[in-house]
């Protein structure tokens, strides 16, 4: 399944990786690995994940206060709209979805 990542979601991911790496060497890599593993799980079965709103699904990242927000565009692709921190600005990402 093809994965499209919104530009701002990619920025969020990179900022979080950098922040975690500054907190503890290797922690940023661990966060990135966890996100990639969850994206792989989303690709295998996107319908398994809970609905956040309308057609937006959410996948929580274990051990980190983040969730991946995505839509299933077809049986062949998903779009990741946000890599959102759980304790900051809820619903800020909604204006990204057209």
Model-derived features with residue positions:
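Arg/Lys-rich, positively charged N-terminal/basic patches that mediate binding to nucleic acids
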Residues: 1-32
């Amino acid at each position: 399944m093809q994965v499209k990542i919104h530009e701002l979601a990619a920025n969020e991911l990179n900022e979080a990786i950098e922040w975690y790496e500054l907190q503890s060497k290797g922690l940023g890599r661990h966060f990135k690995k966890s996100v990639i593993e969850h994206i792989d799980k989303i690709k295998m079965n996107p319908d398994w994940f809970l609905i956040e709103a309308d057609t937006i699904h959410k996948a929580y990242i274990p051990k980190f206060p983040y969730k991946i927000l995505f839509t299933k565009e077809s049986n062949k692709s998903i779009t990741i709209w946000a890599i959102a921190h759980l304790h900051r600005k809820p619903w800020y990402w909604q204006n990204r979805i057209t």
